[in-house]
């Protein structure tokens, strides 16, 4: 059943992407309809030469996840890796598509490996962080979760398909799950414990982001304006992401 659901979601996503294929402009590069892995794919319909090219509709952001506030940047483990998957529409605002708007749906899987204690105290309605003690037997601990959001971007790039690009935008979304995970032992003796008890978890999120790059590749940075935990007496942390964006088509 799980495999069927995953396959259905993948098929629906590909159907939307295929119907939103974009065409080329100009006779000098008739085969270059889009960059990346889907370069020669024009969707269910043949491409029309006279229409402008469009870009960056399926974007993967491979990110290092951190936070800032009561804890400083780069104090967490380097293995705090996450993935944003963005299924976007590129809406041209100019004839050569040098300025456009990007919007769609984004899913984010984030992991922040803090290697400490992050515990919710229900009686006080707060969440606290404490460093690992010598008596603790866990090998690593991390904060992980999933969120869905609607991005909105203003995009600038040169008309050439070998273009330099800048994306400036933001997201509004919902944190659908968040947990703290403790891992003890190795291999066959490995034991994992998850805790979802955060009495003041912020379910809504809003952030700003930027991409700066060339053709299929870009550097990515993101900052969440709202804190992870809402109670002012909790540890105050704003999520930060930085990494590399890859646009397949």
Where are these regions (language model features)?
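Residues on the lipid-exposed face of transmembrane beta-strands in outer-membrane beta-barrel proteins
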Residues: 85-91, 105-107, 150-156, 168-174, ...
């Amino acid at each position: 059943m799980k495999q069927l659901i995953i396959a259905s979601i993948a098929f629906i996503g590909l159907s939307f992407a295929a119907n939103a294929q974009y065409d080329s402009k100009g006779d000098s590069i008739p085969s270059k309809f889009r960059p990346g892995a889907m370069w020669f794919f024009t969707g269910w319909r043949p491409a029309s030469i006279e229409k402008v090219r469009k870009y960056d509709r399926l974007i993967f952001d491979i990110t290092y996840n951190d936070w800032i506030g009561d804890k400083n940047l780069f104090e967490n483990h380097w293995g705090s890796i996450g993935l944003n998957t963005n299924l976007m529409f590129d809406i041209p605002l100019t004839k050569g598509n040098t300025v456009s708007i990007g919007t769609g749906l984004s899913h984010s899987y984030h992991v922040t490996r803090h290697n400490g204690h992050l515990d919710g105290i229900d009686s006080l309605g707060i969440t606290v962080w404490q460093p690992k003690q010598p008596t603790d037997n866990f090998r690593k601990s991390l904060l992980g979760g999933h969120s869905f959001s609607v991005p909105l971007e203003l995009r600038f790039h040169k008309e050439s398909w070998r273009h330099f690009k800048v994306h400036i935008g933001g997201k509004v979304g919902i944190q659908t799950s968040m947990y703290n995970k403790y891992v003890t032992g190795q291999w066959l003796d490995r034991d994992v414990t998850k805790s979802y008890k955060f009495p003041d978890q912020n379910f809504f999120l809003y952030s700003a982001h930027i991409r700066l790059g060339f053709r299929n590749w870009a550097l990515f940075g993101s900052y969440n304006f709202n804190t992870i935990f809402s109670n002012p007496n909790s540890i105050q942390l704003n999520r930060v992401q930085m990494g590399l964006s890859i646009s397949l088509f």
